[in-house]
């Protein structure tokens, strides 16, 4: 069967911009090259002519600050750019430049938004309605159209994230290829990473710089007396607190500050089901520790972003103490009950209690509490073979062969996790929607992928969770379809 083909070829109009918009341009070019059989023409906006606008279909991306065309389209009401700097407006249809041509437009107030817009275009529009190549023998007009080659449905979308900070929580030695890891984060429109590490990687600054070039914030995590049982000191003694305060301030200044990271994540002695240590209430003691140590850091670095990783198991019945944690510190809650806080996505027993507890802690320190949470139900470390790092290491530089081999080893775990995310997605969605609503979008939500080989493939459960962070009020079945249909997502 012959298809009706577009009479005009596409040219991509671009401007010299930063790494994020360059990433978007690269991905757009790669996408279009999957469909067309001709070499794509890239044209600097300053070199654009009236003749080319009439001759070709046009794809253009940018912001009002770096593109005069985008600015004029925005001022004339042709594109509707969201106020949110992570938001974007994407449109595919009849060209505003020539009545018998087509145009693809992606506009935002920031380069990050442009990047997210192109990612969304790839994941949603070209996954739902397109075939992967114009030369595919299985192309069927009853299912697919061929993008950029034949007329396809007009498309328009204005979008911004419901949750501003969407992150991955992981261990440093479980990032095997940091460049691919961060790229796959961007393909899920994630904005931050929290990296727990025993030692600072020797290439930490290079890694942080690369993350920043893609608009990803980096928080390094380390112990503030996380496991006092394995260490020879008594957390109830003031001299222990004084010793740890000096140690932490010194470690931050000498090790983590030079990396250029955006902040610090820490855990103390709350990862236990007991609510007291040697007769002292853990919630009261940890609040004293956290406030004392952080005050010393804030004295010298008042704009430092601190995240307190708090396990609810030891403090859930003593929240009156936790409410006194310095409001400048973001409390990042975990182990708050059933899935999506539970490691096993099968475990949804007691969900209503978990939902009620989440509702309570969201505004524990007031209506504008600096709230965060770690959601689980993804691959974890294998604790039966785990060893702590013994010294400095190089992060994320393993070979492609290593990554592919280890990824195959993780496939069985992903299959189990995928099955229960499919069955219990509504529970995760309810929690995430509550966080987005009650925090007015200011929650810092992290999904724990401790050893899931994100640098190799974006697996369905992580893509679904990321999608929920962006648009938690979309109905569950639509979210499931979007995640499953995405060009970049793999099913186990």
Where are these regions (language model features)?
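Solvent-exposed alpha-helical segments and adjacent loops
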Residues: 1-176, 180-187
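Acidic, low-complexity N-terminal propeptides/linkers enriched in Ser/Thr/Asp/Gly that mediate export
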Residues: 14, 491-492
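Catalytic-core regions of glycoside hydrolase
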Residues: 49, 145-146, 150, 169-173, ...
């Amino acid at each position: 069967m012959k298809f009706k083909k577009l009479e005009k070829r596409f040219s991509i109009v671009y401007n010299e911009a930063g790494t994020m918009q360059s990433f978007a341009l690269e991905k757009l070019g790669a996408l279009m090259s999957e469909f067309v059989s001709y070499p794509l023409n890239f044209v600097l906006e300053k070199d654009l002519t009236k003749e080319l606008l009439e001759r070709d279909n046009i794809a253009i991306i940018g912001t009002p600050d770096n593109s005069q065309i985008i600015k004029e389209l925005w001022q004339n009401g042709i594109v509707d750019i969201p106020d949110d700097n992570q938001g974007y407006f994407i449109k595919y249809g009849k060209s505003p430049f020539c009545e018998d041509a087509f145009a693809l437009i992606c506009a935002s107030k920031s380069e990050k938004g442009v990047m997210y817009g192109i990612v969304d275009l790839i994941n949603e529009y070209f996954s739902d309605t397109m075939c992967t190549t114009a030369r595919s023998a299985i192309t069927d007009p009853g299912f697919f159209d061929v993008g950029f080659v034949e007329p396809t449905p007009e498309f328009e979308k204005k979008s911004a994230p419901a949750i501003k900070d969407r992150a991955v929580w992981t261990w440093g030695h479980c990032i095997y290829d940091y460049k691919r890891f961060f790229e796959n984060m961007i393909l899920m429109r994630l904005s931050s990473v929290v990296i727990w590490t025993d030692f600072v990687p020797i290439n930490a600054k290079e890694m942080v710089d690369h993350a920043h070039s893609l608009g990803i914030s980096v928080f390094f995590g380390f112990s503030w007396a996380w496991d006092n049982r394995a260490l020879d000191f008594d957390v109830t003694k003031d001299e222990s607190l004084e010793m740890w305060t000096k140690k932490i301030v010194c470690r931050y200044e000498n090790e983590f500050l030079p990396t250029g990271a955006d902040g610090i994540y820490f855990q103390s002695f709350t990862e236990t089901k007991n609510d007291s240590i040697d007769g002292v209430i853990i919630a009261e003691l940890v609040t004293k520790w956290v406030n004392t140590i952080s005050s010393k850091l804030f004295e010298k670095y008042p704009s430092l972003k601190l995240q307190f990783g708090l396990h609810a198991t030891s403090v859930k019945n003593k929240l009156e103490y936790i409410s006194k944690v310095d409001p400048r510190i973001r409390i990042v809650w975990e182990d708050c009950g059933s899935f999506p806080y539970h490691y096993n996505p099968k475990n949804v027993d007691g969900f209503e209690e978990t939902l009620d507890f989440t509702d309570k802690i969201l505004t524990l320190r007031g209506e504008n509490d600096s709230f965060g949470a770690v959601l689980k139900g993804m691959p974890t470390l294998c604790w039966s073979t785990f060893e702590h790092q013994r010294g400095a290491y190089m992060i994320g530089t393993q070979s492609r062969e290593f990554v592919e081999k280890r990824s195959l080893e993780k496939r069985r775990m992903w299959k189990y996790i995928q099955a229960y995310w499919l069955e219990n997605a509504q529970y995760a969605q309810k929690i995430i929607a509550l966080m987005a609503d009650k925090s007015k979008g200011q929650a810092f939500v992290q999904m724990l992928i401790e050893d899931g080989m994100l640098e190799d493939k974006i697996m369905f459960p992580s893509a679904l969770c990321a999608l929920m962070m962006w648009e938690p009020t979309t109905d569950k079945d639509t979210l499931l379809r979007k995640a499953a249909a995405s060009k970049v997502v793999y099913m186990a």
